[in-house]
C-alpha cells in the first residue's frame, strides 16, 4: 500500500484510511465493481491469504487466528464492494472510469461533486486493515465482500450455505457511531408503467422546461423521516394544481436517479399557449415561494428554473396526461407508519424514486420498506389500487427480508459490554429502517449471530455524503476491541 492518492491517507487509523484512499481511486459503482474486486483479490493473494470467489461474484478471504486465539469462535467481517453513483448535475464525472476525489473538510471527509462511497467503503477498508494487521489479536477471521448491494443486493441473494465457517458476523454497513444495529427493514421494488399516446403540439404553443432542484435528497430509508422534499412529488403537485388552467401539454417528465435515494431534482418539458407563458411564470414563481415557506427549515437550497426548450417530441394525449399526473399526485410517499415496538423507528415507508419518459410510456420506480411483512403488503396494495384507478400496470420485484432482532444475541451483549468498558456508557441498540444484507444472510446461515456497526456517515446516496473523521477512529477501536473479546468455542 505505498501509493497514496489524496490527503486522507495521512489520517488515523492510517491503515484503514490508506485502504479507503485506494478504494476511492478505483471506480466501483454498483454493477461495475469488478476492477476493485480484482484489486482486492490480487492484494490478498499476494499476502498469502486463502481467497475464493463464489459464482455470484462475492469475495471470501480467510486469515488464521493469531497465536493463542485459535479456539475463539470464528468471525466473519462483512462489507459490500459497490457504491451509489450520484453526482451534482453540473459535475462532469463518469463513475465507471473516473476516481472519486475525497478531501478533508474540517471534521469530515467528503468528495468533489459526487457521492464519497464511505457507504460502505470505510467498512470495506476496515476489513482489509484487519487482514493487513500484524498486531491485532483475533480468532479465525473470514472477510466476506459482497457485490451489488446498492442496486439489488445481488451478492447477498446469491450467498449459499457452505461458504462461511464463522459463528459471528460483524456487518460494517451502519452509519451512526454510538449505535449498534440488531435488526433492519425488508423491502421490495415497485414499477408503475403508464402506456401513453401522443398528439402533435398545437400551433401557437411554446415549449418550456421547468426544473426543480437543490433539494437535499438522501437515503430513502435512513432519511425518509426527516421531512425532506421529494422532487418528483413536488413537481407532480404543481402539474396537478395548474395543468388545466394553463392548458398545459406534458411532453416529458424525468426525476430522480435511484429507487433508494430521495430525488433531489426533477424536470418537466411542457407546451403552453403562447399567451399563457406569463401566467405559467407567475404560477411557477409563486409555487417556488410556497415550497420555500413550507419546507424552508429543512430544504434551504430550493431552486427552480423556467427555461425555453426546443423539442421534436409530441405531447401526451389529454387523457393520458391526466391519468399520469393524477396518479403521481395521489401516489403515497414518505413515512407510512412509525413502529409501535421500537420508539422513534419508522416501520413502513415508500419512496417515489425515479420517473422516466419514453416515446410511448412513463415509468415510476418506487421502493417500499417495512419492518413487518404485512406493512409492506399494505403499501403494495395501495400502489396497486392507484395503478388500477389510473389504468397503469404495476410490477413488484427484488423483495428481500428484514432482519428480525434476536433478544438473546451473544455478540450484541459482548458489543454492549465492550462499548461500556471503553466509553463508560452503553451504546444505543437499534433497528434500522434500511436494508442491511444481514436479513438475507440469515437464510443460508440461520444460526449466525450478527450485529452491525460503523462510523458516522451523513447524507449517504447523495453528493453531500460525508464521514466524520473522529468516528472512524472510534469505529476502528471498537472493531479491534470486539475481535479480542470474542469468546471461545463451546
What are these regions (language model features)?
Residues 8, 13-16, 340, 347-349, ...:
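Zn-dependent metallopeptidase/amidohydrolase metal-coordination segment
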Residues 27, 107-110, 150-151, 157-369:
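Midchain, well-structured core segments that form catalytic/ion-binding scaffolds
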Residues 223, 230-232, 237-253, 405-448:
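Active-site-adjacent substrate-binding region
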Residues 345-430, 434:
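Substrate-recognition/cap regions that form aromatic- and gly/pro-loop-enriched pockets
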Amino acid at each position: 500500500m505505498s501509493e497514496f492518492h489524496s490527503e486522507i491517507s495521512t489520517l488515523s487509523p492510517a491503515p484503514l484510511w490508506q485502504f479507503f484512499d485506494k478504494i476511492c481511486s478505483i471506480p466501483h459503482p454498483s454493477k461495475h465493481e469488478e476492477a476493485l474486486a480484482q484489486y482486492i483479490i490480487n492484494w490478498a493473494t499476494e499476502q498469502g491469504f486463502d481467497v475464493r470467489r463464489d459464482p455470484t461474484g462475492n469475495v471470501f478471504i480467510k486469515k488464521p487466528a493469531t497465536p493463542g486465539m485459535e479456539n475463539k469462535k470464528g468471525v466473519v467481517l462483512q462489507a459490500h464492494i459497490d457504491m451509489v453513483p450520484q453526482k451534482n448535475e453540473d459535475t462532469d464525472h463518469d463513475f465507471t472510469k473516473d476516481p472519486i476525489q475525497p478531501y478533508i473538510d474540517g471534521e469530515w471527509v467528503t468528495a468533489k461533486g459526487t457521492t464519497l462511497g464511505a457507504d460502505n467503503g470505510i467498512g470495506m477498508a476496515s476489513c482489509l486493515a484487519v487482514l493487513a494487521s500484524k498486531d491485532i489479536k483475533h480468532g479465525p477471521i473470514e472477510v466476506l465482500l459482497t457485490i451489488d448491494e446498492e442496486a439489488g443486493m445481488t451478492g447477498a441473494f446469491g450467498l449459499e450455505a457452505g461458504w462461511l465457517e464463522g459463528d459471528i458476523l460483524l456487518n460494517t454497513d451502519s452509519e451512526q457511531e454510538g449505535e449498534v444495529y440488531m435488526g433492519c427493514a425488508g423491502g421490495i421494488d415497485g414499477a408503475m408503467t403508464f402506456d401513453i399516446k401522443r398528439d402533435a403540439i398545437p400551433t401557437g404553443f411554446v415549449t418550456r422546461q421547468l426544473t426543480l432542484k437543490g433539494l437535499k435528497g438522501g437515503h430513502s430509508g435512513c432519511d425518509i423521516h426527516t421531512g425532506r422534499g421529494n422532487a418528483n412529488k413536488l413537481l407532480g403537485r404543481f402539474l396537478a394544481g395548474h395543468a388545466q388552467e394553463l392548458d398545459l401539454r406534458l411532453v416529458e417528465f424525468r426525476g430522480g436517479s435511484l429507487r433508494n435515494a430521495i430525488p433531489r431534482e426533477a424536470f418537466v418539458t411542457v407546451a403552453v399557449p403562447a399567451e399563457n407563458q406569463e401566467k405559467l411564470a407567475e404560477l411557477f414563481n409563486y409555487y417556488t415561494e410556497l415550497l420555500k415557506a413550507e419546507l424552508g427549515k429543512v430544504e434551504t437550497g430550493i431552486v427552480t428554473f423556467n427555461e425555453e426548450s426546443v423539442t421534436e417530441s409530441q405531447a401526451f394525449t389529454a387523457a393520458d396526461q391526466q391519468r399520469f399526473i393524477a396518479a403521481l399526485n395521489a401516489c403515497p410517499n414518505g413515512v407510512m407508519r412509525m413502529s409501535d415496538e421500537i420508539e422513534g423507528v419508522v416501520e413502513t415507508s415508500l419512496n417515489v424514486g425515479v420517473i422516466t419518459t419514453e416515446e410511448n410510456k412513463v415509468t415510476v420506480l418506487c421502493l417500499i420498506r417495512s419492518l413487518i411483512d404485512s406493512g409492506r403488503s399494505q403499501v403494495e396494495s395501495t400502489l396497486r389500487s392507484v395503478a388500477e384507478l389510473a389504468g397503469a400496470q404495476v410490477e413488484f420485484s427484488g423483495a428481500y427480508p428484514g432482519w428480525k432482532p434476536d433478544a438473546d444475541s451473544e455478540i450484541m451483549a459482548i458489543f454492549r459490554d465492550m462499548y461500556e468498558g471503553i466509553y463508560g456508557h452503553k451504546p444505543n441498540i437499534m433497528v434500522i429502517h434500511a436494508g442491511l444484507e444481514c436479513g438475507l444472510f440469515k437464510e443460508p446461515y440461520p444460526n449466525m449471530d450478527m450485529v452491525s456497526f460503523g462510523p458516522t456517515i451523513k447524507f449517504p446516496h447523495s453528493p453531500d455524503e460525508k464521514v466524520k473523521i473522529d468516528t472512524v477512529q472510534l469505529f476502528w477501536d471498537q472493531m479491534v476491541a470486539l475481535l479480542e473479546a470474542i469468546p471461545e468455542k463451546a
